[in-house]
Amino acid sequence: MNTGSRLAKNLSVRGNAVCGVGCYSAVIEKRDTDETVLKIGTTLDDPWLGYYQDVIVPLKGNPFLPKINHVREFFDCEDGYYIADMETLRPTVNTDLSDLCKEYVCGKVCSSELLSMCALREVENPDKLLSLLDKIIEQTDCFSYEDAEETLANISFEDSKFYRMIDLHDSNFMEREDGTLVIIDPWCNIDMSEVESLDSWWDEQRHG
């Protein structure tokens, strides 16, 4: 078990509520405030760090991006991990808009259709949503499992860590109290075979 995984599990044991768990990270509530949470990543190969560096920082202020106070990376003899301090969000109920985002990223609707549908839904700042989605598309290497398999056939496992596959499932959309949709994590690695996932631990905690 790597250091990041142990840290997330120890905080849970000490009574910090777990907001959510994914393959690479766990989001933990703070005891002293409900306005921000800690995102603990178990590996520095997590594509979310690329999202932070290549999208969140350049597009700072975009309302559809999570607000990040700081990200700190740590290295030890076993593996690297990171801790991000970020705003508290809630699961989205605005699935119409998140589905529209998925359709645009996958090429099923064009930009004019996206903007028209946003207008019908009275979405504020649709141009900023479009610019964010275009940035995600620009930074994505694979848009399907078929794309990933074809890419993997021509590169080494080590090189695969630098390739991003789109991963816009429902849990990667959240929202603020005012209902603003937030895209928290659009990518996964194209090769997940050696990822030490926290999902099994979280399932045991909830159902064991």
Predicted regions and their residues:
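Juxta-kinase regulatory segment immediately upstream of eukaryotic protein kinase catalytic domains
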Residues: 1-15, 137, 141
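ATP-binding glycine-rich loop module of kinase domains
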Residues: 15-75
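Conserved hydrophobic "DFG−1" position in protein kinase catalytic cores
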Residues: 29-30, 88, 175
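Conserved structural core of kinase catalytic domains
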Residues: 66-146
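A generic "structured core" feature
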Residues: 82, 134-168, 175, 181-182
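Catalytic activation segment of kinase domains across protein kinase-like and atypical kinase folds
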Residues: 157-208
